């Protein structure tokens, strides 16, 4: 009995052990439990490291928040930039397509509109294709001039008053003009008067009077010309406009005063003599007047070969008397001579406003008399551009003032000098 029950008692524990061991050793853990263990370990490790950092907890939390914000901001910027690029590409494609269509059709559209406009014009005017269309020309407004006329029967003198001008056109770059007026009688034109130049104005007030010695019996056959010019120091003066008054249409029983509109000037048939450029300089303390003959251009052809041999004479005059005379060298075979020659005259300050400088351009001739090409004078009783040059010299002592002058017929200048003795 004892032997039989003992094996059974021994076997039971074996079976029990066999069933318990596998249950304790091989039962698998659930996925949630594994992740929780890993997170717990990581958290525990992080907290251990965090406690090692020598900062208070609130500082660590602030750093963490800033880091998170930076990461979020960077992500937002990257996403926005990507979206913006996509939109631009899309718009560019749409815009390119539209432009291509417009560029393709623009010529046809322009032709169509042009043809339509021509048809509309023809319909309005009633003209056919074979008829020529003439556009009406608007009259150019040149301004107007106020003047007065009177005759002194006792002294046989025609008195011409240049009062003022208005609404003149702007011929200079700055939107203004430098106007002055020329007055002369036709047909002789020997005696010309000029008003003073008024700078930078379109409405100059002159109030100047000029006297022509003309017998009344001859006055009816003459025509008075009043021409308004724009002064230019370094080039030819531009004519703004003019008008003519036949003397046989004027009633000299009373003083005539009226406004007249300026008309386009007729082309002058007078032969051009050329232009000369010279500078003036006056030193009051030394009483020294310096004239520098610089150059001349477009001189009249005097020789058979179509050229000239020009030189220049300078006379210092007072009361019709020649005080001193100078002359330049001769330039052979040219109509545009260059001199750059200086001449000095002693003129005391109290005499400077009483003298005249007469400049004459002549053509040298080995055989015979040297012919005068043209002449001009500045100084006492000069007018227009010549008076302006002299005034500028006096207003700027010690400074050379250069200016171009148009040469005039010698006889006309001599007549003016003779009258103004």
Curated annotation (Swiss-Prot):
Which loops or segments lie on the Vesicular side of the membrane, by the record? Answer: 1-57
What does the cofactor field's note say?
Answer: Binds 3 Ca(2+) ions per subunit. The ions are bound to the C2 domains.
Ligand binding (Ca(2+) 5)? 303, 363, 365, 371
Name of the protein: Synaptotagmin-1
Residues where Phosphotyrosine is found:
229
Gene name as annotated: Syt1
Residues the record marks as carrying a glycan: 24
* Domain description: The first C2 domain mediates Ca(2+)-dependent phospholipid binding.
Membrane-traversing stretches: 58-79
Q: How does it sit in the membrane?
A: Single-pass membrane protein
Q: Where does Ca(2+) 3 bind?
A: 232, 235-236, 238
Region span, Disordered: 112-141
Q: The organism sits in which domain of life? A: Eukaryota
Positions contributing to Ca(2+) 4 binding: 303, 309, 363, 365
Span list, region Phospholipid binding: 135-381
Which species does the entry assign this protein to? Mus musculus (Mouse)
Among its keywords, does the record have Cytoplasm?
A: yes
Annotated GO biological processes are:
calcium ion-regulated exocytosis of neurotransmitter; calcium-dependent activation of synaptic vesicle fusion; cell differentiation; cellular response to calcium ion; detection of calcium ion; fast, calcium ion-dependent exocytosis of neurotransmitter; membraneless organelle assembly; neurotransmitter secretion
């Amino acid at each position: 009995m004892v032997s039989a029950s003992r094996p059974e008692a021994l076997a039971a524990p074996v079976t029990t052990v066999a069933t318990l061991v596998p249950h304790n050793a091989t039962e698998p853990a659930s996925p949630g439990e594994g992740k929780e263990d890993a997170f717990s370990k990581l958290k525990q490790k992080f907290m251990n490291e965090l406690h090692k950092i020598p900062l208070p907890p609130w500082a660590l939390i602030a750093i963490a928040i800033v880091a998170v914000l930076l990461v979020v901001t960077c992500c937002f910027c990257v996403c926005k930039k990507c979206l913006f690029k996509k939109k631009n590409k899309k718009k560019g494609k749409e815009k390119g397509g539209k432009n291509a269509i417009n560029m393709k059709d623009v010529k046809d559209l322009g032709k169509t509109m042009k043809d339509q406009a021509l048809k509309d014009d023809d319909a309005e005017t009633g003209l056919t294709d074979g008829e020529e269309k003439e556009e009406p020309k608007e009259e150019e407004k040149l301004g107007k001039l106020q003047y007065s006329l009177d005759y002194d029967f006792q002294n046989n003198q025609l008195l011409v008053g240049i009062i003022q001008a208005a609404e003149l056109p702007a011929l200079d770059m700055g939107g203004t003009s430098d106007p002055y007026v020329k007055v002369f009688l036709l047909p002789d034109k020997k005696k010309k008067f000029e008003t003073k130049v008024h700078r930078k104005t379109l409405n100059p007030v002159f109030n100047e009077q000029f006297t022509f010695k003309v017998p009344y019996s001859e006055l009816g056959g003459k025509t008075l010309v009043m021409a308004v010019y724009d002064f230019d120091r370094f080039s030819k003066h531009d004519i703004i406009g003019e008008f003519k008054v036949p003397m046989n249409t004027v009633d000299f029983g009373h003083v005539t005063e009226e406004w007249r509109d300026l008309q386009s000037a007729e082309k002058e048939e007078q032969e051009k003599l050329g232009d000369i450029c010279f500078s003036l300089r006056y030193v009051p303390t030394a009483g020294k007047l310096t004239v520098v003959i610089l150059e001349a251009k477009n001189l009249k052809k005097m020789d058979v070969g179509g050229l000239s041999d020009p030189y220049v004479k300078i006379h210092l005059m007072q009361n019709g008397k020649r005080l001193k005379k100078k002359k330049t060298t001769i330039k052979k075979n040219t109509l545009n001579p260059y001199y750059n020659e200086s001449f000095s005259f002693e003129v005391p300050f109290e005499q400077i406003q009483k003298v005249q400088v007469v400049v004459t351009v002549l053509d040298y001739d080995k055989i015979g008399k040297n012919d005068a090409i043209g002449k001009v004078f500045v100084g006492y009783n000069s007018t227009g551009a010549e008076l302006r040059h002299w005034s500028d010299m006096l207003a700027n002592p010690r400074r050379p003032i250069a200016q171009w002058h148009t040469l005039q017929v010698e006889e006309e200048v001599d007549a003016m000098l003779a009258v103004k003795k």
